[in-house]
């Protein structure tokens, strides 16, 4: 999975089992504290590993690069990830790159959000939302 450094914006690869650990950016060597932004899911195996190892709820943003509302909501998702740090993992799934996940969870419109607990979806909603709404919604899962 990829975590973006807040200092130099380099995308750093992190194993799902280490998302709660602190690390160091491979480029600028600044600390990569856990939960500072959304985790970019690279493949189905990483997604499954994240859900299997998560000890907190996982909020997933299903999006696509061509989707205007998805682009508009991206900063809101990032803000929600910072606010929810330690209480919820926030992940992003590009439905164009990972259509199997979109099909598995019956994503028919984007942006779509699902909250998972113990590997199972417990909440879902579709459409653009503000960070405070995401925090309120996902924080109660």
Model features per residue range: what roles?
Residues 5-8, 25-28:
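Short cysteine-rich clusters marking metal-coordination/redox-active sites
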Residues 12, 32, 74:
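Cys/His-rich microdomains that often coordinate metals
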């Amino acid at each position: 999975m990829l975590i973006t450094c807040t200092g130099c914006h380099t995308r750093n690869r992190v194993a799902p089992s280490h998302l709660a650990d602190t690390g160091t950016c491979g480029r600028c060597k600044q600390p990569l504290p856990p939960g500072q932004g959304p985790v970019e899911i690279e493949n189905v195996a990483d997604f499954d590993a994240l859900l299997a190892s998560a000890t907190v709820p996982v909020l997933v943003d299903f999006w696509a690069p061509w989707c205007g509302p998805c682009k508009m909501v991206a900063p809101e998702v990032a803000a929600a990830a910072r606010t929810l740090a330690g209480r919820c993992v926030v992940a992003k799934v590009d439905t164009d790159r990972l259509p199997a996940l979109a099909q598995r969870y019956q994503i028919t419109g984007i942006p779509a959000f699902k909250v998972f607990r113990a590997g199972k979806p417990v909440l879902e909603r579709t459409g653009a939302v503000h960070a405070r709404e995401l925090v309120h919604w996902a924080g109660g899962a």
